[in-house]
Amino acid sequence: MSGRFSRSIYVGNLPGDIREHEIEDIFYKYGRIVDIELKVPPRPPCYCFVEFEHSRDAEDAIKGRDGYNLDGCRLRVELAHGGRGQSSSDRRGGYGGGGSGYGGGGGGGGSARFGVSRHSEFRVIVRGLPSSASWQDLKDHMRKAGDVCFAEVTRDSDGTYGVVDYTNYDDMKYAIRKLDDTEFRNPWARGFIRVKKYESSRSRSRSPSRSRSRSRSRSRSRGRGRSHSRSRSLSRSKSPRKDLSKSPRRSLSRSISKSRSPSPDKKKSPPRAMSRSKSRSRSRSRSPSKSPPKVREGSV
């Protein structure tokens, strides 16, 4: 490797309160330092890139400071793979955009030859990695099964794990068969790892989300249908109650009106009958009073 890549080193597992002048104090004796780029991710540990004037100085710094104990943190010093002289996106591709090789935010490694990482669809996930594992350690171990084009180490609630991309399908299948349940080791730790085919979260979440959405829509439609039927049944059941409640009132009002209407007729009818009977009796009483004079005239 030539150019700026060979003059730049990657320093990982730095303390969270590290300053640039402290980094300069650690590496100044190996040669003239051109630039120091310190990275402080949201989660520790920190890491940095140090660029020397000569590539020989960078090699001496790696030999002298790799494994150096700084305030209880064991430094990891290695040659920067695409970490310097590239854009920020290339740096993220070379080192995962943050964190050292110790899982403090993850690390990704691309091709050491070109300093550029590339992904593929032939991906495996590696569980059971020690917390001190770096992407370079993972790549070196998984390279036993085939050509690795990308490696990344990160951490979740289950611990430290890695993602490895192979250039072809056969190497991926061979890695699952050969490297599953094998011992992984680096200078600081060792452990048995599990290697499985990587399944993206999208493919996992698609089918449940569809089934859930369908079941929810069905349950909602059923619930709505039931609510409509209940509302209809309630409206139907309420209607007779209203009729029943209204009908007695109407019948009562009608009965009351009927009972009220004849009462004045009855009260008024007796006077009419009395007046008629009185008039008839008067007429009858008048008629006999006129008859005696006629008899008298006949007798004369």
From Swiss-Prot:
GO molecular function: mRNA binding
One GO term of the biological process aspect: RNA splicing
Bias (Low complexity) ranges: 253-262
Subcellular location: Nucleus speckle; Nucleus, Nucleoplasm
InterPro entries for this protein: Nucleotide-bd_a/b_plait_sf, RBD_domain_sf, RRM_dom, RRT5_SRSF_SR
Gene3D superfamilies: 3.30.70.330
Function as written in the Swiss-Prot or TrEMBL entry: Probably involved in intron recognition and spliceosome assembly.
PANTHER family for the chain: RNA RECOGNITION MOTIF RRM DOMAIN CONTAINING PROTEIN, SERINE_ARGININE (SR)-TYPE SHUTTLING MRNA BINDING PROTEIN NPL3
Complex formation: Component of the spliceosome.
Family assignment from sequence similarity: Belongs to the splicing factor SR family. SR subfamily.
The protein's name in its UniProt record: Serine/arginine-rich splicing factor SR34A
Gene source species: Arabidopsis thaliana
